[in-house]
């Protein structure tokens, strides 16, 4: 998936969203599932119609264009990990790039580096891009390596949903897909995740 080339390999060099692991469990003897609390974070997102992989490619291109200088400050914004950058200042890229299906299409999101606020983050020139602060979320997460094919993601999404049903944990929305690596990373070293928002315990 060449659209992730700019992301680089997810490692300690890339900033990632902060979360707290509340619990973990092994499901069906092999799937490690975590329950996480995510803090609010500043993000840029775009909604794209089409099949999942094509929509991710187009959404990544639009958001990468923004962080690499197509913004009101003409500033590079450093990338973060996962996918859910005036002068030559940098907006670092984060990881992962995240993707979730909505009624309007696929929402592709980049988390913005923690150094920015809504006031200091350069504004996108492309009006398709929305800047927002995410709500605090509790998420169930299933991590896996290998290729991020449609079949693998849908399979892992079903496994995670089955676990939540078994545990009688109510969900709040559709699965979110998180991509941490570039396409040149060896498959067994890739980090992919399926995340499902869930109800917080009272």
Predicted regions mapped to residue ranges:
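A solvent-exposed interaction/effector surface
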Residues: 2-202
């Amino acid at each position: 998936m060449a659209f992730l080339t700019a992301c680089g390999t997810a490692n300690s060099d890339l900033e990632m969203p902060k979360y707290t692991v509340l619990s973990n469990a092994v499901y069906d003897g092999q799937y490690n599932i975590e329950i996480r609390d995510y803090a609010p974070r500043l993000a840029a997102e775009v909604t794209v119609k089409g099949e999942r992989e094509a929509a991710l490619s187009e959404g990544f291109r639009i958001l990468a264009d923004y962080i690499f200088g197509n913004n009101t400050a003409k500033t590079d914004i450093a990338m973060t990990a996962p996918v859910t950058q005036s002068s030559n200042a940098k907006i670092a890229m984060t990881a992962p790039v995240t993707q979730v299906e909505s009624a309007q299409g696929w929402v592709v999101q980049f988390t913005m580096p923690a150094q920015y606020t809504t006031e200091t983050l350069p504004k996108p020139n492309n009006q398709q891009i929305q800047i927002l602060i995410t709500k605090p979320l509790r998420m169930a997460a299933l991590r896996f390596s290998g290729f991020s094919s449609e079949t693998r993601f849908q399979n892992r999404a079903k496994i995670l949903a089955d676990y939540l049903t078994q545990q009688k944990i109510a969900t709040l929305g559709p699965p979110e897909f998180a991509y941490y690596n570039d396409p040149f990373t060896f498959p067994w070293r890739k980090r992919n995740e399926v995340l499902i928002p869930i109800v917080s315990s009272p």
